[in-house]
Amino acid sequence: MQKVTIQEAEHLLQEIMSEEDDRFQILIKDERKGVQKLISKWYKQKELAQKEKEKFLEMSKYENALREKGLTYIAGIDEVGRGPLAGPVVTAAVVLPEDFYIPGLNDSKKLSEAKRERFYDEIKAQAIAIGVGIVSPQVIDEINIYQATKQAMLDAVANLSCTPQYLLIDAMKLPTPIPQTSIIKGDAKSISISAASIIAKVTRDRMMKELGEKYPAYGFEQHMGYGTKQHLEAIEAHGILEEHRKSFAPIKDMIQK
């Protein structure tokens, strides 16, 4: 191989998967600082990819154990929006195929918005089935947020295009005959729950951004309905909306004044 430019070396390293590659053996002997920098970057990327693979494998242990028992339709379930003062609680149920792989998959709260959006599209493309459950602020006020979350989760399961054989749920138990396991911090321990958390989060964020367009004075697209200083000041200045949860403090206290 003739001596390559730094740019050509960069392109080559994007193609090279192993140190055994003859092209890599030539590049590693190239003493130019630019090439050595690229080699160092290549090693770091390989190390990161290996860590992501190990993390993904660790997060697949619940699904793999159930598949070993002959189960195929394993639904991960998670919710988003229990704490906000406005907007719905949104849940998702996701059934993944055995060959599913997205490096870097994690609890949706630990991902950037750009990464969540990208993973959302990838999950949509790869999943066997996705169901979403949405419960309004009015119903939350009627039956309380805990019961509303349960209802949204049951709705998400009902909205799947297949009947799940097992449920992996983030920190909840559901009144259903389907066998289930409740996992504390499940969105960081199970790929199915993690995928569900991303679907639920992106779905709800998009709804809140639409609400932000409808009520520009409230800034919903920024705080997603949570009780930030900006949100509380907007309520004081412009009043309580039908999208607000009247049973949540401090809105409840404002109504009682």
From Swiss-Prot:
It comes from the Bacteria. Its cofactor is Mn(2+); Mg(2+). One of its GO terms (biological process) is DNA replication, removal of RNA primer. InterPro entries: RNase_HII, RNase_HII/HIII, RNase_HII/HIII_dom, RNaseH-like_sf, RNaseH_sf. It is found in: Cytoplasm. One of its GO terms (molecular function) is RNA-DNA hybrid ribonuclease activity. Signal peptide: none annotated. GO terms for cellular component: cytoplasm; ribonuclease H2 complex. SUPFAM superfamilies: Ribonuclease H-like. Keywords: Cytoplasm, Endonuclease, Hydrolase, Manganese, Metal-binding, Nuclease. Manganese or magnesium. Binds 1 divalent metal ion per monomer in the absence of substrate. May bind a second metal ion after substrate binding. A divalent metal cation binds at residues 78-79, 170. Its EC number is 3.1.26.4. It catalyses: Endonucleolytic cleavage to 5'-phosphomonoester. Transmembrane segments: none annotated. Residues 72-257 form the RNase H type-2 domain. NCBIfam families: PRK00015.1-1, PRK00015.1-3. Belongs to the RNase HII family. Endonuclease that specifically degrades the RNA of RNA-DNA hybrids. HAMAP family: RNase_HII_B (MF_00052_B). This is Ribonuclease HII.
